[in-house]
Amino acid sequence: MIISAASDYRAAAQRILPPFLFHYIDGGAYAEHTLRRNVEDLSDVALRQRILRNMSDLSLETTLFNEKLAMPTALAPVGLCGMYARRGEVQAAGAADDKGIPFTLSTVSVCPIEEVAPTIKRPMWFQLYVLRDRGFMRNALERAKAAGCSTLVFTVDMPTPGARYRDAHSGMSGPNAALRRYWQAVTHPQWAWDVGLNGRPHDLGNISAYLGQPTGLEDYIGWLANNFDPSISWKDLEWIRDFWDGPMVIKGILDPEDARDAVRFGADGIVVSNHGGRQLDGVLSSARALPAIADAVKGDITILADSGIRNGLDVVRMIALGADSVLLGRAYLYALATHGKQGVANLLNLIEKEMKVAMTLTGAKTIREISRDSLVQNAEALQTFDALKQNNAA
């Protein structure tokens, strides 16, 4: 199969992966309206073409939390990454490290902190949820600090799991789920050999290390369902801010007032995100939410964005709408499932090339030069953004 875009990796991953795994990353909450709008709204943002600008010395380099990045991207935290390729977190982290961008390890990774961190030169980032088991949270933070993790990404948009109807149909959950997953595994031999047999153990590495016993997929579903904490408030984050002496990023911001609260709290960054459309269906896409948030807090806090980014043009669009950098999630997981570390490396190279084309043809020589001026101001999508900003201000 010829791979020329992230969409090609998605098609390849669908053939390789058992359906319960493919649809787990590909699907969203409820009827998946927000999942679709994430991609559609971002692709509707019209770039402003400029010509004859002497773009010979173009640079994608940027600085984020005092780290030099080869381009304004990082790999997002993705749960169960090690189920998509053999020791998937290690492979993805290696590709990010080689490219000169950060890798973020999920709380619910297959490979534990201690397995991934020693394999890369750049300090990785670590993602954590607010959970009922505060002992686990403290244990995870201590281990992340000991492993040299530089930045804490704190996910706050999961006080309760989203309803993902597709999971019940795919075998991730629902009737006879374990039997259905077994049958899917044996009928997908490439995955069964590479990951099913040779990618063991299939533990939730960070949780197993804390509990002192092996964990599996059923434990993942049950443990998280019992540990998400709907009583979470800003006060619950204070001890974490005191404990963690590195950059702290709040992930899951969609409203300007919440962004202002993050500034008042003392966070170093926010991620404008709807969890990839996997939590509350019907909320704004990240692309629609971002401009008003940027207007509210740009310059007071570092702004990252995710959800819907599928290529380098989307990265440029998000930065033009107000982000300082972006997180890549689904796109890199499709590539990882297809060709492992090399797939992720190739995807990052594709995104880099696409960014260079977009920047060359919009007249932005550096990341700092990408702004609202890089967009067509009277495009339909931007008119919608302006209307939303006016409604938020009213």
From Swiss-Prot:
Role noted for this protein: Catalyzes the conversion of L-lactate to pyruvate. Is coupled to the respiratory chain.
Amino acids binding substrate: Y24, Y129, R164, R278
Subcellular location(s) of the protein: Cell inner membrane
GO molecular function, one term: FMN binding
Name of the protein: L-lactate dehydrogenase
The reaction(s) this protein catalyses: (S)-lactate + A = pyruvate + AH2
Domain FMN hydroxy acid dehydrogenase: 1-380
Tagged with keyword Oxidoreductase: yes
HAMAP family, per the entry: L_lact_dehydr
PANTHER family associated with the record: L-LACTATE DEHYDROGENASE, S -2-HYDROXY-ACID OXIDASE-RELATED
Gene source species: Klebsiella pneumoniae (strain 342)
One GO BP: aerobic respiration
EC number(s) given by UniProt: 1.1.-.-
Any one GO CC term of the record: plasma membrane
